[in-house]
Amino acid sequence: MPTSDDDLLIGVESGKYDIGTKGIWKTPAREKKYIFPKNNIGASVIGVTIRSEDANTIKNLDDFAKAGKKLVPIAPQNAQYQVVTDYNAAHLDHPIDLEASENFEIADAYSWVLEGRYDGYFSIELAYQKNVTAKDAPYGQFKDKLTYFRYKALPTYALVNKKETKLAEEVDQALGELKKEGKIAELEKKYFGEELDLLLDKQ
């Protein structure tokens, strides 16, 4: 059943749904509310959209942070907020200025970066590709003015209601079998052009 991110999270927590899948990452807050099977489903590559004119000097997140660049604000309940928080905890000498905000339109984020109001937009690579670089992308008019660099890949999981321990075990077992058979790697290559799980090993 297709649903929004918020409905999935609230629905699985409340018991409306037993399980949900939507590119979910682990966070300490989520681990208190849900069961995460040990085996991940796949991975999401995350990084930063920046102005093309900055691409020669900003090639990674360290460059971005050390240059004192500003990220488009992130909602605290968004898992990406936790990723930047973790980065800052590990890089106390050059943390990223992390501003909390409520949700906003994606078009605003790209416009703010182009205007210079902010210097980067932290997002999933697949979203950048769909929104900016793909054929007939909704913000394709920005593709010559924006570029993207990867930060890291994060494992994504099925999300299971706290009471559904048996279901979580069955899902975990099934995912383990699919991994051993190479089915997940096969699907990643088909839909993403590469085996995303391999990127996790490089972190």
Please annotate each region the language model reported:
Residues 13, 21-32, 82-86, 114, ...:
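A ligand-binding cleft/hinge motif common to bilobed small-molecule-binding domains
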Residues 42-47, 79-83, 136-172, 175-192, 194-203:
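Periplasmic-binding protein-like
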Residues 78-103, 110, 132-138:
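Ligand-binding cleft/hinge of the Venus flytrap
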